[in-house]
Amino acid sequence: MRRLFLFSLLFLFFYSSSSSRSSSESHIFIYGGCSPEKYTPNTPFESNRDTFLSSVVTSSSDASFNSFAVGNDSSSSSSSSAVFGLYQCRDDLRSSDCSKCIQTSVDQITLICPYSYGASLQLEGCFLRYETNDFLGKPDTSLRYKKCSSKSVENDYDFFKRRDDVLSDLESTQLGYKVSRSGLVEGYAQCVGDLSPSDCTACLAESVGKLKNLCGSAVAAEVYLAQCYARYWGSGYYDFSSDPTNGDHVGKSIAIIVGVIAGFAILVVLLSLCRNSMH
């Protein structure tokens, strides 16, 4: 019985450590944007915005995507008080991690964009956006963020062929989320959930085109447009976590240190229990 108990503790430790890493990585900051126009506190817009953010948190425990229109009915005192917004989690996230990511987004967007009539926030695992104008379902391929790795590849025919195969596969999707791999080159892409299949394909084609034009021979790159994104990396050449341009290194370092200390403490307890069971 004691051995079964020890095995259960070990399983719980390694499972929770893996889950924690997955959850923490989804919270990594990618980009944020705030409208220059500001609203006055304690106004109908602020009330509608707070209602939207509360609805987002509630909905994210059940769905990976949802959109909202708050205060846009005829009884609204002013059309400028309406809030249109959406959230979306990366399609491979568990529902619990999606909910945590969205909660983090809500907490951060109010700090990054206080009193803004419009704001957007992209984390590694989720996206949050609201505006006072109705943008829902309307195609928008404006560039929001790009990152090209500092390392590049020259005269490697196999790499570029596999990269282009992956990117062609990504831009052809009409499913909203796609993962692709060719040899050591991997990538994934996603559209917001309210885009039609044809608009999603068009958005991803634009994103892939910008990846090639803006990042050239980079061994890894990511391009985020207003309603879709695409990214790729050569796993044999590149590790995103080692790139000095990758964000949130302080947070990662702290998480690693805390994880190591916690793991060491649990192992000490387990060894002590094993020693006691032998006597």
Swiss-Prot record:
InterPro entries the record matches: Cell2Cell_Antifungal, GNK2, GNK2_sf
Domain of life: Eukaryota
Reported phenotype of the disruption mutant: Affects accumulation of ACBP6 in the phloem.
Region spans: Necessary and sufficient for plasmodesmal targeting: 254-274
Distribution of this protein across tissues and organs: Highly expressed in pollen, lateral root and elongation zone. Higher expression in the reproductive tissues (flowers and buds) than in vegetative organs (leaves and stems). High expression in shoot and root phloem companion cells (at protein level).
Subunit structure: Interacts with ACBP6; interaction occurs at the plasma membrane.
The protein's name in its UniProt record: Plasmodesmata-located protein 8
Organism name: Arabidopsis thaliana (Mouse-ear cress)
